[in-house]
Amino acid sequence: MLFRSAGYFSLTVGQVDTLEAPERIRKGMGQYPLPVVILARLAVSVVDQGRGIGFGLLQDAIRRTMLIAEQAGIRAMLTHPIDEEAARFYTRFGFIASPLREQQLLLLLKDARKVIQ
């Protein structure tokens, strides 16, 4: 029996320079680097696209980020979309662009809660 993956994601932790974060995310954080969870990859197979799998994976990634944040003081989730279509996907769910890095999108964890409700 053969199995195939409909999609996957991967997470890691990191930090963002304060000036790279949008004002709404860096507010009240001083000049210290902002702790983030990086959504390093999120992909859905071509045959499974358009079925809500990407949204489900994003919700799962956010839930896991919330668990990490309880222990590590994470402020936001960060991703680097591979292309404009991916960027549009993330911005639909509240990710906002970095003022200094066009291909870097961030989601404040307070806003992320809305995506998983």
Q: What role is predicted for each listed range?
A:
Residues 48-50, 95, 100, 113-114:
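Gram-negative outer-membrane beta-barrel domains
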Residues 50-64, 92:
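Conserved acetyl-CoA-binding loop-helix of GNAT-fold acetyltransferases
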Residues 58, 81-86, 102-109:
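Short glycine/proline-centered loop/turn elements that form peptide/ligand docking sites
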Residues 8-41:
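Conserved acyl-donor/pantetheine-binding loop and adjacent beta-alpha core of acyl/acetyltransferases
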Residues 40-50:
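A short, internal acetyl-CoA/4′-phosphopantetheine-binding micro-motif in the GNAT/acyltransferase core
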Residues 6-7, 99:
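A structural microfeature
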